[in-house]
Amino acid sequence: MVEIGMGRTARRTYELSEISIVPSRRTRSSKDVSTAWQLDAYRFEIPVVAHPTDALVSPEFAIELGRLGGLGVLNGEGLIGRHLDVEAKIAQLLEAAAADPEPSTAIRLLQELHAAPLNPDLLGAAVARIREAGVTTAVRVSPQNAQWLTPVLVAAGIDLLVIQGTIVSAERVASDGEPLNLKTFISELDIPVVAGGVLDHRTALHLMRTGAAGVIVGYGSTQGVTTTDEVLGISVPMATAIADAAAARRDYLDETGGRYVHVLADGDIHTSGELAKAIACGADAVVLGTPLAESAEALGEGWFWPAAAAHPSLPRGALLQIAVGERPPLARVLGGPSDDPFGGLNLVGGLRRSMAKAGYCDLKEFQKVGLTVGG
């Protein structure tokens, strides 16, 4: 702890950019490295989950990411469930963003588009398209809308439910309605639930005790895109937050005699090196936003914005153009080949090489790799 003033202390925390991986074992061939992981009954060949935003995930994007071994999470409260002509609406949004450099112009239009009511039939049809392709189907809902939307999604045939907000606690209390008790809610479902975001050990442990199969660390923070720090004064030191959640996972494992809850890191991960650092800090998988927005399959055509940007009264994000011109296919973003010397392409290939250089063959072992702090 450090003193920030008389009688007020704060904890020193670390970002992913402040730590480094320390290879200290015999190196291995990257061909011998496995990046597979399993969430409940569902196995994935790569530890990559798409951030649930309309900028990325359409049914077609989710299908392609699933085919490549990852998980695409559809935003259950996004434009896909509100507009039949969602591609036209997004084209209108991108045109507004490109025409006016003032961020509020595009945000106002995004808010207007989100003011349309959710259509369960549209949402169900999107889920059905993903499910029919034979890949794992996951949809994100907010804690506020989980109780009424979940039955619709379960009936449509989802495999995984993601309950995600900027911050999620084990119980959501509201004076204008019934509180959402996640433990009771999850126990009544027949499908696994992933919940988040959390920023510390205590909240992560509380969420694990609700019966969640996975816990999300962070809220998808991205410099220049998410503005939760500016709006709420809340930011996430991802290296520390991931390590804290991993410690909560160990504590819960001991507490329950063997129940393992997966930790998913969501925020400030843009390169293969940052992906590797997130796993090294204790994450089982990462939730990616801007790196995947560069792909040709992304619905936002090179633009990115978080779901929180559409909040009707307090938007916490902006639209940012990530890629211009011809964009690489998702397969190349994840698996290469790459001509980017800064780690923006071949993300999983970079992770494999990092694991091999450090002498580890699987993700859980790699969580034990040595780390140093710079500065």
From Swiss-Prot:
| EC primary class | oxidoreductase
Presence of the UniProt keyword Oxidoreductase in the record? yes
Q: GO terms for CC?
A: plasma membrane
- Please name the SMART domains in this protein's record: IMPDH (SM01240)
Q: Name one GO biological process term.
A: GTP biosynthetic process
Q: What is its EC number?
A: 1.-.-.-
Q: Which Gene3D superfamilies match?
A: Aldolase class I
Miscellaneous notes for this chain? Answer: Was identified as a high-confidence drug target.
Q: What does this protein do?
A: Has no inosine-5'-monophosphate dehydrogenase activity.
Stated family: Belongs to the IMPDH/GMPR family.
Q: What protein name does the entry list?
A: Uncharacterized oxidoreductase Rv3410c
Lineage in the entry?
Bacteria, Bacillati, Actinomycetota, Actinomycetes, Mycobacteriales
